[in-house]
Amino acid sequence: MVENSYVLFARLCVELFHELPPLPSDESHGDITTFERLFLRKCRIELENASPKTEHLPLVYVDETNYYRFIKTVRVLAEVYKNSKITETTRKSMIQVLMNPILPPERITDAMNLFRSIIGKLADFHFSDEKFNQLVRSSRVVELEGNYNEEVKLRKEAEDALAMKKEDVEMMEQLLESYKEEQGKLQLQAKALEHKLEAELRHRKETETLLAIERDRIEKVKIQLETVENEIDNTRLKAEEFERKYEGEMILRRESEIALEKEKKELEEVKLKLETYEREQENLSSEVRTWQDKYEQESSLRKLSEYALSREQEELQIVKGLLEFYNGEADAMREERDKALKTAKEQMEKRQPPSSFFCPITQEVMKDPHFAADGFTYEAESIRKWLSTGHQTSPMTNLRLSHLTLVPNRALRSAIEELV
């Protein structure tokens, strides 16, 4: 019986090798758990615990051939486990041989239930040599019948393929005829496209001519634009030159004032303040003109300072000569000088700064005047505070400022420093 069981298991192993897929294992080592391993373990547990027999088999749709194979496998397993005709090691080896799929995945659960329900009944079945040989012969007949059915199926598929091939040949002939007609149409279309291409080439030549004329015009405009840019650069250089001249005049003016103060030691309390300019230009036409005006003003101031210095030197020489010859008249001259100083101080106290010295926001004399985009001059701290609070309009005109850049008004600042 054991030898016949080995033969049957070997045949079933070959026939059922690709029938059932392996199941992923939940174990840490990652081995594949097969369906046979699962239901054989269930079979052993049921037989050892003498589970109750199931009367009715579940309704499971299984292919007839696979179903008979399944029943044969179950019967042999039941006989082996019940009678214990082989050792535990041999049974484990047989189980390892049978660790291959039998049914599709969707039928795994039903097949397991079917096996568990019938394993108790089939375990009581006793095989005789005649019945076992008949079982083997019937399995061989089923195998031959399956092979014959497979051959018939393949022959039918070959005949269908031949019929489809004939249809494809007829279709290719029809396509060839239609291709010839299409070729004639394409030749006509090619001639039409050739005429269209010639017209397109003529149009392209005309377009290229117009494009060349337009390029010449663009080149002329570029030359004009470069000329304008050069003029702007020259104007900017002139502005920088006038600014440098203005700064040089300021340095010369300070040197002249220092020299004047040295020459007038005896008259140092008398300060003749010359008002250079007291007006404010609300709208500057250009930066070049502004610096040019400042340069001319500073030049005139320097000339006046030099003239005043020379006059003071002459007067000082005359005074020194008179002091040498007229000691008596020196006291009178000193009294007259004191009176002149007193009169000058009174005039300076009565004199009020011009309105251009006051900030339109704070209404106080400015210390750091700056130009804004609206053309007005403001105290730097006040106008920055106005802009930082979110205002983008002029405090004087209430119009939107074109930009928020502030420019120092150096000329006005110098005039304020001289007067105050």
Curated annotation (Swiss-Prot):
Functions as an E3 ubiquitin ligase. Residues 4-168 form the MIF4G domain. SUPFAM superfamilies: ARM repeat, RING/U-box. This is Putative U-box domain-containing protein 58. The keyword RNA-binding does not apply. It catalyses: S-ubiquitinyl-[E2 ubiquitin-conjugating enzyme]-L-cysteine + [acceptor protein]-L-lysine = [E2 ubiquitin-conjugating enzyme]-L-cysteine + N(6)-ubiquitinyl-[acceptor protein]-L-lysine. One of its GO terms (biological process) is protein ubiquitination. Residues 139-352 form a coiled coil. GO terms for molecular function: ubiquitin-protein transferase activity. It comes from Arabidopsis thaliana (Mouse-ear cress). It is an enzyme of class 2 (transferase). InterPro entries: ARM-type_fold, Ubox_domain, WD-SAM-U-box, Znf_RING/FYVE/PHD. Pathway: Protein modification; protein ubiquitination. Keywords: Coiled coil, Transferase, Ubl conjugation pathway. Residues 352-420 form the U-box domain. It comes from the Eukaryota.
